[in-house]
Amino acid sequence: MYFKKSRISPMTRLSLPLIAAGLILSGCNDTRDLAPERADRAWHPHKSTGLSLPASIRSPSFTAGSDGVNAGGNTSALMTRPDHPGMVLPENQDRALSLPQLIDLAERNNPRTRVAWEAARQAAIGVGMSRAAMLPQLTFSAMGGFQRMALPLPNYLSSRGYLTSNGAAAFPKLELDYLLLDFGRTRAQINEAKYQTLAANFGFSAVHQQLILDVISAYHAQQAAQAIVAASHHAVENMAILLQSAQSRHDHGEATIIDVATAQRNLAQARFDLDKANDAEHGARHALLEVTGLPATLPLAIDAMPARALPRSTPGQIRQLVDQALASRPDLMADIAKLRASDEAVLASKAALRPRVAFAGTASGYLGGLKTYGTGRNAPASTIAQPEAGAFLQVSWPIYQGGLRANAIHMAESRRDEAEATLLKDRLSIERQVADSQDALETALAQVKSAEVLNRAAQTANDGATQAYAHGVGTMTDASTAAAALFEAQAALAVSTAQAFTKAAALAHATGQLDLVNNVPDTLSDSVP
């Protein structure tokens, strides 16, 4: 019995290797090994990832500038460009930095200001991108290549039954599209971008105000930490005097060994508190340098806070302060700008329901040649190089898109309602912040007064108890208690004083008055470019 051998078509023979290659390649595309192997172990790369800090960030360059301060308290301009990647430092680094200089350095160095600035610049660029839709759009394109074609023919026309043609051509083309009318859609999109820019600019101001508050808070925290270090040194000196008195009285048989041991314990505790205070001061200094945008290891001296009167509180003007905050807070102004932007987005989505009218024009050319074989005689090659042009008035009006445009309107309206709710939420939050800041300032000022009385009383009690013990009419317990109370009183006075100035700055921030320049227009419509 014979079986007829099956024949595999050339197309099948060509397809089988391609299918096999596709299956093999798809099996090679398993990328699960790129994820961590186990859920209960931290991931570590098996080989170098090629990731490293850029040189400008790993070892930033420093730009020296002037550290002088004019009579108005503003630092003079430093020799650096706004887009310079290096850090700005004072020219004379041996001089201690004052609070205005620290604020100026923070505004120049802290990355938060650059992030907010770039966001504002991106929003401004977005206005230009939206305006581009109203300008003529020119597009040039070109295509060229070679093509071989085959066409079957009857035998009486071609002895081989087909003819072939080889062609090579290039097609340059210039297209023009110019929007004539879209019933306000593009204009609404431009206005939306403008309001978004305004919101980003107010956000930039809010970042600066928050940064100023952070510098002030860190500065006064560092000053309080320094005062606690000084109080700790004083406590060590007092405990050393008590130990000397206890040892002297013990040598003369007037004190027990328990008094000496108690004095030694108190001195050790005072030294422990001093070490802890030094560590806290180092941490406060590092935090201040960080918020200033400088490395924590940079050896810069911080100027002590000059003696000045405590800030004042005006409890009867809380409504005035709230109104001032509602008119000046940049974050609230940003919310208003975002609300206006969402209004324009609603208008743009509704305008999308209307037709779009545009002018379109084309200018192109065909440059190429064609040669045909198989007609029984050699045909000469034909070439062409001719221009083509056209002008059109184009009207596009989508009739049905499955509810896409209606849902776009619903989405824009929902975002508008969200922006309005956010504005209301932030308004209530600002009122609470003003009230809380006012109460916190009043409390801090009251604590300063109490701490001053406490400090004077503790100083008097410590002097008396120390002298009494030294003359044999007091006890070690009373002297130790008085010395510890003096340290606590001095620390409380330092902390409460720093808190008073910090709370005053927080109140200025809550009312939007913390920056040096505060020029907010009455209506946002006047500020739209």
PLM features: what roles do these ranges have?
Residues 2-4, 29-57, 148, 296, ...:
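Acidic, low-complexity, intrinsically disordered peripheral segments
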Residues 25-27:
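C-terminal motif of bacterial Sec signal peptides marking the signal peptidase cleavage site
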Residues 29, 206-324, 440, 444, ...:
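Periplasmic alpha-helical coiled-coil/stalk elements that build and connect Gram-negative outer-membrane
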Residues 58, 65-69, 73, 78-83, ...:
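Short amphipathic coiled-coil heptad-repeat segments
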Residues 114-115, 131, 166, 180-208, ...:
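Sec/SRP-type N-terminal targeting helices
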